[in-house]
Amino acid sequence: MYLVREYLADSYVIDADVYINRNFIVTDINKSTYFSAYKRNVKNEWKLCFDENKKVNDIEIINGDGFILCGVSYWSKNDGILIKNRIEEVIKMDDFTNLYWDDIVKNNLKDLDVRIKEINDDDIYEIDNIEDLNMVKDIIENN
């Protein structure tokens, strides 16, 4: 993320390990948003905790069920600039060995205005291993 930090403001981020089964990308968006599906029986996934206004107030790593990070997000101009600045600070401290870029968001939620947009559980699939890849292949072939 460091290499593209200048482009975060007013931009979508789509992780490279996801298959989008239905286009849920919207053009009329102005608040930072995690697109999230409710997934069951997940292992070591990042769960979004949010209030009645859909404002994300925490991210927990869980085993079980919940609305999880699905690999698609949008970042407003202000939030994108803040994330860029925090990424630069972390790089300067040279302490980023086991750091995901989403850790920057997680650790700065109090300073960000991030919402959740709920999507269907079959709208997106994360491909972490050959089993996931084969499952997505079956979905594509059977549609």
Positions of PLM-derived features:
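Conserved beta-loop-beta/alpha segment of the NTase-like Rossmann-fold superfamily
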Residues: M1-W46
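Structural signal for conserved beta-strand scaffold positions within catalytic alpha/beta enzyme cores
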Residues: Y34-A37, D58-I61, I116-E118
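Short acidic/glycine-enriched loop/turn segments that link adjacent beta-strands
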Residues: V42-N44, G66-F67, D121
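Conserved active-site beta-strand-loop modules that form the wall/rim of enzyme catalytic pockets
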Residues: W46-K47, K55-N57, G71-W75
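Short, surface-exposed charged micro-motifs
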Residues: K47-C49, R115
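Short acidic-glycine loop/turn motifs at beta-strand connectors
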Residues: C49-K55, K110, N120
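Short, flexible, basic/aromatic active-site loop/helix in glycosyltransferases
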Residues: F50-G66
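Conserved alpha/beta core of the MobA/IspD/sugar-nucleotide pyrophosphorylase nucleotidyltransferase superfamily
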Residues: L69-N143
